[in-house]
């Protein structure tokens, strides 16, 4: 559960992330494909080389979902409900991949915006991304 301090930290960080989120999300996807090759299964039709337009386009989708989650921190589950349903029912993505992407997002954010990451902000970011992952797998039951 995100505290008010967590929400404030996430919103404060996102003011800096927002301008770079498409790049960060594409970078995180590339990192995930390299670190967790099995995650490429769902993107067999993609050219997975870095800076590829397909990765950037999917990164933009990830970015949009994260922006929506930040905009609705009091209702992340409701905000991501349709996306959760899509991944669970239609795409049938193994939920472990959300955790992989979460970790890669944290690394990418740190690589791009390390000057804005104090320990308390990192903890809040981690809790936020955990909440996003938890809510994305909510329709798997």
From Swiss-Prot:
Binding residues for heme b: 87
One GO location term (cellular component): hemoglobin complex
Disulfide pairings: none
Segments forming domain Globin: 1-141
Tissue: Red blood cells.
CDD domains assigned to the protein according to its UniProt record, in alphabetical order: Hb-alpha-like
Recorded superkingdom: Eukaryota
Record-listed O2 binding positions: 58
Signal peptide: none
Molecular function GO terms recorded: haptoglobin binding; heme binding; iron ion binding; organic acid binding; oxygen binding; oxygen carrier activity; peroxidase activity
Keyword Cell division belongs to the record: no
Stored PROSITE patterns: GLOBIN
BP terms from Gene Ontology: hydrogen peroxide catabolic process
Keywords associated with the record: Heme, Iron, Metal-binding, Oxygen transport, Transport
Similarity comment text for this entry: Belongs to the globin family.
PANTHER family the UniProt entry points to: HEMOGLOBIN FAMILY MEMBER, HEMOGLOBIN SUBUNIT ALPHA
Quaternary structure (record): The major hemoglobin component (HbIII) is a heterotetramer of two alpha-2 chains and two beta-1 chains.
Function of the molecule: Involved in oxygen transport from the lung to the various peripheral tissues.
Protein name per UniProt: Hemoglobin subunit alpha-2
């Amino acid at each position: 559960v995100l505290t008010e301090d967590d929400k404030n930290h996430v919103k404060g960080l996102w003011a800096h992330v927002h301008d770079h989120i498409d790049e960060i999300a594409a970078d995180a996807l590339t990192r995930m494909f390299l670190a967790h090759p099995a995650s490429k299964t769902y993107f067999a039709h993609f050219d997975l080389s870095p800076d590829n337009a397909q990765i950037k386009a999917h990164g933009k989708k990830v970015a949009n979902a994260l922006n929506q989650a930040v905009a609705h921190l009091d209702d992340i589950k409701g905000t991501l409900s349709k996306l959760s349903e899509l991944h669970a029912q239609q795409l049938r993505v193994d939920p472990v991949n959300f955790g992989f992407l979460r970790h890669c997002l944290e690394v990418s954010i740190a690589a791009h915006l390390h000057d804005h990451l104090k320990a308390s902000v990192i903890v809040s970011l981690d809790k936020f991304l955990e909440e996003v992952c938890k809510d994305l797998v909510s329709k798997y039951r």
